[in-house]
């Protein structure tokens, strides 16, 4: 076993405009080739689009979208006696948020459209309205966990 002490998790710093850790975590997911300012501009433009379309505060729409996309359970492969079982496990809060952000950015990139900020805004609004690809992904994960409920006693 390693003698070195475990590192403490670094908390994401809040972003400069909305003072939200979630927005900063999203910035890191959007980031490409170290261009953080561009990633922030994409997010802030997306939030402006959300505010114009919904008339609500964009950060509240974003937070509700994250809550709705966050999975509660997932399946992990566990090898027992030569066969591999998909064992349903509860998702911790931080991992759930991370997965939600990852799915929202992934499906926003895959959308057809002109600008990334428009695609991101549409994906966030769809997630807040419980439609869209990221919500479908969450439901698919939950369905897999439900189907493999019989192997729940193999939890580790």
From Swiss-Prot:
Keywords in alphabetical order: Chloroplast, Plastid, Ribonucleoprotein, Ribosomal protein, RNA-binding, rRNA-binding
Location (main, coarse): plastid
Q: Would you say which domain of life the source belongs to?
A: Eukaryota
Does the keyword RNA-binding feature in the UniProt annotation?
yes
* Stored SUPFAM superfamilies: Ribosomal protein S7 (SSF47973)
GO BP terms in the entry: translation
Q: GO molecular function, one example?
A: structural constituent of ribosome
Q: Where in the cell is it found?
A: Plastid, Chloroplast
User: What PROSITE patterns does the entry give?
Assistant: RIBOSOMAL_S7
Q: Does the keyword rRNA-binding apply?
A: yes
Q: What's in the GO CC field?
A: chloroplast; small ribosomal subunit
User: Function, please?
Assistant: One of the primary rRNA binding proteins, it binds directly to 16S rRNA where it nucleates assembly of the head domain of the 30S subunit.
Tell me, how does this one assemble? Answer: Part of the 30S ribosomal subunit.
Q: Which family does this protein fall into?
A: Belongs to the universal ribosomal protein uS7 family.
Q: What is the protein's given name? A: Small ribosomal subunit protein uS7c
Q: Which organism is it from?
A: Guillardia theta (Cryptophyte)
The top of its lineage is: Eukaryota, Cryptophyceae, Pyrenomonadales, Geminigeraceae, Guillardia
